[in-house]
């Protein structure tokens, strides 16, 4: 009986800890998204890119210019540029200095380095999980601060270093 009471008590403690994490998550304020460039399905009509209601296999950035009332479209290609990027989790303590990088569309890049070198931080900056202190990050020539976060994240493919495979075939794990 003492063994069972101990196991039940342990289950209660684990449940309370899980509940506490859930309530902390529910209390979080939603992240602000001030982006206005969106990702849309598109088609080419002659040399002009137009938005499509159907899935076309082609994506474009839709940029509405408030000042002129004009909407333009730019085909999603996928080049990423870091131009003199500075970042620190605490703005007073910059940990990444003058980062310059260019990734061509479709190019596969691996960030390699020791623990704490900034590999994950760079992928977090591309996803706009954090804002940079200085410099620019551009995606297809567009400052990523102008792109809606959800659309930006939909357009990226990132493979992290920790892979988790489950029982089954490779296809079942995909």
Regions found by a protein language model. Name each.
Residues 1-27, 34:
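Cytosolic ends of transmembrane helices, especially the final helix of ABC transmembrane type-1 domains
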Residues 18, 28, 149, 153:
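ATP/adenylate-binding site constellation spanning eukaryotic-like Ser/Thr protein kinases
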Residues 24-42, 89-90:
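Short intracellular "coupling" helices and adjacent cytoplasmic loop segments at the cytosolic face
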Residues 42-174:
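ABC-type nucleotide-binding domain
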């Amino acid at each position: 009986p003492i063994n069972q009471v101990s196991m039940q008590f342990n289950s209660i403690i684990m449940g309370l800890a899980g509940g506490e994490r859930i309530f902390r998550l529910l209390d979080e304020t939603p992240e602000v998204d001030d982006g206005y460039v969106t990702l849309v399905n598109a088609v080419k009509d002659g040399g002009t890119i137009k938005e499509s209601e159907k899935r076309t296999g082609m994506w474009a950035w839709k940029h509405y210019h408030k000042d002129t009332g004009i909407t333009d479209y730019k085909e999603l290609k996928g080049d990423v540029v870091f131009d003199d990027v500075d970042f620190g989790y605490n703005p007073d303590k910059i940990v990444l200095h003058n980062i310059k990088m260019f990734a061509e569309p479709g190019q596969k890049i691996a960030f390699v380095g020791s623990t704490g070198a900034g590999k994950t931080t760079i992928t977090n900056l591309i996803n706009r999980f954090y804002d940079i202190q200085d410099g620019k990050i551009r995606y297809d020539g567009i400052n990523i601060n102008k792109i809606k976060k959800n659309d930006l994240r939909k357009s990226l493919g990132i493979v992290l270093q920790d892979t988790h495979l489950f029982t089954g075939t490779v296809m079942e794990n995909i």
